Amino acid sequence: MGKYILSVTLLLLVGGSVAAQETNTVSTRFGALTVDEAGVLLFKSAPFKPTIEANNSLDLGKPFEIGAADVVLVTDNGGTSCPALYYFVTVTKSGAKVSPAFGSCSDLITVKRNGESISVSMPGYQGPSESKRAQLRAARETHVFIYHAGVVTENGKPVK
């Protein structure tokens, strides 16, 4: 009986450590995007240059097939000062390219595909260290980021 309990306990411990090392993966037509256990974004098991590393965690969206490219929205989950920033990864047969980070820090987004473009809309954001007035003013703003042909813009200007 004691051996049985020890065996079950060991199985639970081993199973728990495997679950803690799970990776986040999305398949594209041209290879897999993966977030490794350290929170680094990989394409075909290799990190991007410069490295895209999670603040707290990275979430990978479902790929959009746009012509000869698959486009994936990546969410970089942060903390209370900036809950989320975003990247688009454009994956083609010749490789993968990451956009500059964009967003207002809000994690409340609406994503829509419009033909060959993708829009990401969100309210403005001011963190808890800002005044309530500043937080309310920011929440009334709407920021719209447009992905088209590998470029992300806000108000017609490229995000840098």
Which residues make up each language-model segment?
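N-terminal signal peptide c-region/cleavage motif recognized by signal peptidases
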Residues: 14-17
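Acidic, small-residue rich beta-repeat scaffolds with periodic aromatic anchors
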Residues: 20-40, 109-160
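Repeated scaffold domains used in trafficking and secretory/extracellular systems
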Residues: 54-64, 104-113
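Acidic/hydrophobic-patterned starts of short beta strands in beta-sheet-rich repeat architectures
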Residues: 66-77, 88, 118-122
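His-enriched metal-coordination microenvironments in redox/metal-binding proteins
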Residues: 77-83, 103-105
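Short, surface-exposed beta-strand/strand-loop-strand elements in extracellular ectodomains
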Residues: 85-92
